[in-house]
């Protein structure tokens, strides 16, 4: 016969550690379908993250600039709670949420030091997929 699950003594809930990080990096991954914002410290340890799909936007609404704005506001507020005051922004991808996510972070009162486009560009590497015909 199977044992009954143990009570609360066996379950451990990890308390969120509040770091005090003044400077960070905001990684914005803007694809055509979604926008993911991750805010890290200088070493690359994630402090907070949010995505358009995680904020309740589904389907084609995920890929809108407004969805990216909402996601970056959520990630930015969580980073401010961790003590972040200055951010470098690294944008990757061609999606529609590129600019609106940076504007939303600036509107929260976070000082933006630098904006860099780190979209990977091939030096004629792999052959691209065939052209879509509708």
From Swiss-Prot:
The keyword Kinase does not apply. The keyword Cell cycle does not apply. One of its GO terms (cellular component) is ribosome. One of its GO terms (biological process) is translation. One of its GO terms (molecular function) is structural constituent of ribosome. It holds the Pfam family Ribosomal_S11. InterPro entries: Ribosomal_uS11, Ribosomal_uS11_bac-type, Ribosomal_uS11_CS, Ribosomal_uS11_sf. PROSITE patterns: RIBOSOMAL_S11. Keywords: Ribonucleoprotein, Ribosomal protein, RNA-binding, rRNA-binding. Belongs to the universal ribosomal protein uS11 family. PANTHER family: 40S RIBOSOMAL PROTEIN S14/30S RIBOSOMAL PROTEIN S11 (PTHR11759). NCBIfam families: PRK05309.1 (NF003698), uS11_bact (TIGR03632). Located on the platform of the 30S subunit, it bridges several disparate RNA helices of the 16S rRNA. Forms part of the Shine-Dalgarno cleft in the 70S ribosome. Part of the 30S ribosomal subunit. Interacts with proteins S7 and S18. Binds to IF-3. This is Small ribosomal subunit protein uS11. It comes from Albidiferax ferrireducens (strain ATCC BAA-621 / DSM 15236 / T118) (Rhodoferax ferrireducens).
